[in-house]
């Protein structure tokens, strides 16, 4: 579920390019296998934001459950089209495999850092121009929510880390945990553009990916809202 799979969208793209999976299966994979790890959710979101490991474990459980529920929804009876053509797998020397893996890992790492920095900068510019505050104010008026809550939502839509970090100081409550669950499952536009860069050149459907992440985030928020009301 992302962690077990490694969240390796570059790997999904290569498998699709090699014909190992169908386009529909690859499109499902990038939605389903795109989740935050337990260290970030429990440590950064739970302990760092809410000062509670219990809240972190709760958010992680909601995060995984939402992914599982969405996975069942999108392919309840979908066939798994896997190619077992042995000709696709050719022997490679250890030195060549090691060199290629290090290069691909470095490229992915640089790409991830670049998108995080870019969207953090965009977030900073929007804050400096008071655009975020203005939009948050409108949302606060329409939804009847706190200004800081709306500002965190907007930050989380752009970049996951900034969104979760913006929630620091908010109390443990169903509505705040629901917001954290939404941001964690949505992932942020920064993560989405990282995914797009990895699957570029393939026929994997990006529209399904965006819709899937948004629906998963809504499921997570609903689960957190209901669960937190009973637990916290």
Model regions: which residues?
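C-terminal transmembrane helix pair
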Residues: 39, 64-68, 173-232
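Alpha-helical membrane segments and immediately flanking helix-loop junctions
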Residues: 1-50, 153-170, 177-202
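Hydrophobic alpha-helical transmembrane segments in multi-pass membrane proteins
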Residues: 40, 67, 71, 108-120, ...
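Transmembrane helical segments that form the transport core of multi-pass membrane transport proteins
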Residues: 102-180
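Helix-coil boundary and interhelical linker segments in multi-pass alpha-helical membrane proteins
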Residues: 47-56, 170-174, 229-232
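Intrinsically disordered, low-complexity non-transmembrane regions of multi-pass membrane transporters
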Residues: 78-104, 137
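Transmembrane helix-loop junctions in multipass membrane proteins, especially transporters and channels
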Residues: 52-53, 71, 75-83, 128, ...
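Alpha-helical transmembrane segments
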Residues: 55-71
